């Protein structure tokens, strides 16, 4: 099953995704896309790391997400990807539109063939005002397009607000 868990910053989306991974009763691999480039991000990573069960495997991959999913997906495994918007940020910061398109398309193209459970976590960025800066507008647009394409392919899509899940597609939680 493919699941997409959306929400704003500190909405409870990662905690929900972690609970779903635990509830799957499968072997879990956590795929982290962040690059802790400053102290605050390092603290966030440490917080997430401390909350995860020790038996979960960890793969850190900031760019080649489709490759890691193809290599790691198994029928008896749950892959938890946290998060897609950081992955998108990493690609945007390369300032290589062709690479971004190739990586995004590779991700979307591989999903149907992946066995097991895949849970994606991502920040919902499209509910605010239109950003003033060009790069920020592009980020919000790319995230919105990615979320739409993923939601089409996922069996369950959940929006998390204030720690509460709102199922948008699929079986309610």
Q: Predicted regions span which residues?
A:
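Conserved P-loop
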Residues: 2-72
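Residues at the starts of beta-strands that form the adenosine-phosphate
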Residues: 26-29, 77, 117, 156
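Short, hinge-like loop/turn segments at secondary-structure boundaries
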Residues: 47-49, 75-76, 137-138
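A generic alpha-to-beta junction signature in SAM-dependent methyltransferases
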Residues: 72-73, 114
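A short, aliphatic-rich alpha-helical micro-motif
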Residues: 73-74, 151
């Amino acid at each position: 099953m493919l699941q997409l868990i959306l929400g704003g910053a500190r909405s409870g989306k990662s905690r929900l995704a972690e609970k779903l991974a635990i509830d799957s009763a499968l072997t879990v691999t956590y795929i982290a896309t962040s690059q802790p480039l400053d102290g605050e991000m390092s603290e966030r990573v440490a917080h997430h790391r401390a909350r995860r069960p020790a038996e979960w495997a960890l793969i850190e991959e900031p760019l080649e997400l489709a490759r890691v999913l193809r290599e790691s997906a198994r029928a008896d495994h749950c892959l938890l990807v946290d998060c897609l918007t950081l992955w998108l940020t990493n690609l945007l910061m390369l300032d290589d539109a062709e690479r971004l398109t190739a990586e995004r398309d590779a991700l979307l193209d591989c999903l149907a063939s992946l066995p097991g459970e895949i849970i994606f976590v991502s920040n919902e960025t499209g509910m605010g005002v239109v950003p003033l800066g060009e790069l920020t507008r592009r980020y919000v647009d790319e995230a919105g397009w990615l979320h739409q394409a993923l939601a089409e392919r996922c069996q369950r899509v959940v929006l998390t607000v204030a720690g509460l899940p709102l199922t948008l597609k699929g079986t309610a939680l």
